[in-house]
UniProtKB/Swiss-Prot annotation:
Glycosylated residues in this chain: 108, 191, 260, 373, 411, 496
Entry's localization field: Secreted; Lysosome
Covalent S-S links between cysteines: none
Organism: Rattus norvegicus (Rat)
This protein's name: Arylsulfatase K
Stretch forming the signal peptide: 1-17
Amino acid sequence: MLLLLVSVIVALALVAPAPETQEKRLQVAQAPNVVLVASDSFDGRLTFQPGSQVVKLPFINFMRARGTTFLNAYTNSPICCPSRAAMWSGLFTHLTESWNNFKGLDPNYTTWMDVMEKHGYQTQKFGKLDYSSGHHSISNRVEAWTRDVAFLLRQEGRPIINLIPDKNRRRVMDKDWQNTDKAIAWLRQVNSTKPFVLYLGLNLPHPYPSPSSGENFGSSTFHTSLYWLEKVAYDAIKIPKWLALSEMHPVDYYSSYTKNCTGKFTENEIKNIRAFYYAMCAETDAMLGEIILALHKLNLLQKTIVIYTSDHGEMAMEHRQFYKMSMYEASAHVPILMMGPGIKANLQVPSLVSLVDIYPTMLDIAGIPLPLNLSGYSLLPLSSNTSANDQAFRVHHPPWILSEFHGCNANASTYMLRTGQWKYIAYSDGTLVQPQLFDLSLDPDELTNIATEFPEITYSLDQQLRSVINYPKVSASVHRYNKEQFIMWKQSVAQNYSNYIAHLRWHQDWQKDPRKYENAIQRWLAIHSSPPTHSPLSLVHQWLTTHSSPIAVDNKKTFSSYT
């Protein structure tokens, strides 16, 4: 940079930058390197006690001891693409309209990595990104509309396990290991005289596809080797409590049914699914460890801030579900750990944070001024031991986090406000579906909905949620989007529509009576685009009592544009 400035001055070909611009570039040149490792479906509760006792995670424990662990970190949308869109944009889901796994950020959206590159950072990405639109299957483009149509179809295979009986088989998820190797190779050749930012996206511990369940039937196989399974403390695995099907919240019942989890499961099945999931987490930890070890061997560890996080968690049979797509802790709670120069060691931070905080944190690390329109806040003040920094965070960061979900496998747009001891979950327009309220200090398993017992608290939290997001308007907007997308898709496939629709993820149920389901879709398309006026609660009840086929709901949209 200095040579460039000298040549500019000597040649008089360009106007020299202002002194403050030169100062900022010099600050960036002296800034630390950053490595962000983001996995998929990692339950954040495994990064601290007591969850960390169930599986050996040596490199996460290494980061805990030498850095900061955020004890209450949450996804802003518990599904892959929208959550990653929040992380890469620093904005809530409804602000970018990243509604589902098909609809994310625009391809040319300016991410934090783009900003850091513009300010002089060397940048590189490997592995799973999944934050922009159009990268998922047709199913993900059109599946969300099923919540608005009067049928209830299983959209996933029943969760199963698959073991490689090899105590020496360490590399199970080949694609992730290959990307880890690529990241390490890049570190070996990077110019260490300039700061760099490296991103590694891992697929694990996301469940694997289940071809035995049929074409396009989701990913419901928990797959590992004996090498990793031996890292799990089997006796420490907790069998989650379930409500009876008749007692479940209607949205939870819909999710459990579409995820193919309403059948009978033995305790041994449940325990094995959870054990295999934890083993997949152990393999994830090992890849994080390879990056940390490479930084150490290259004498870069002391110059590099390492951040580990995940897009969302994994239900692993809690609340009779697997996958994510829920506001329960298993799905919504994510890991965020940081270590490196300037990061306080062995610090546990109880403040509520979320993935939108990654964007301002990355810029803050680089010394780059933060945009004023971000939904998130830098986590750097919380990683220090000085009370002044912590107080500064508390003054600016609101004492709540927002998460929202608009994708498939749930029959209502869902909004979660997490604040203090409370978790408040609202659905649809706030009237069609009853809300949920949990006191996490007394009910960490979230089994007792106390919304009707504490109406004043419920009302207060709902008003607070509405001050953050006009969720009835957002829900209506998503409802319109779902219908528009389905109509566009139906027109694009023309005469092949029936064949395509029969091979989406619900095809096994669909083929039992395709004419009935096609007629249900036609009735839905015939009505205008306003949200339905009937309650998913009544439809689920009708299905349970008559074994016919109902469900309904609506969806959402933006805060700034929809207030």
